[in-house]
């Protein structure tokens, strides 16, 4: 699936653990979501995440499993993003996420 990366931060370290999410966003609110995601990405990276990505699908071809928009039950006025954060390990993820949730910027 071709993707656009409105937000993407990465370090050079290899990741071994990933948190991934499908996020449904109203198309007319996508710019607002990207602004919020950029702020969130900076917070995750400041607390040690190895990478932070927000990917918007441009093309969801049939015959490639269940396309994300169908799986996420998107309306025609919505789009779906595949968002993921990378970490060294599950323990590293747990520590980073705890710090992020305690961060006043969130």
Which stretches of residues belong to each language-model region?
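Short S/T/G/P-rich N-terminal loop/turn motif that feeds into the first structured element of a domain
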Residues: 2-106
């Amino acid at each position: 699936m071709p993707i656009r990366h409105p937000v993407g931060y990465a370090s050079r370290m290899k990741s071994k653990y990933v948190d991934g999410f499908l996020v449904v966003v109203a198309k007319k609110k996508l710019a607002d979501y990207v602004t919020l995601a950029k702020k969130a990405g900076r917070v995750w990276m400041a607390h040690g995440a190895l990478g932070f990505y927000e990917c918007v699908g441009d093309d969801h071809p049939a015959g490639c499993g269940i396309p994300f928009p169908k799986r996420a039950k998107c309306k025609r006025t919505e789009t779906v993003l595949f968002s993921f954060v990378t970490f060294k390990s599950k323990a590293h993820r747990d520590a980073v996420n705890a710090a992020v949730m305690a961060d006043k910027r969130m």
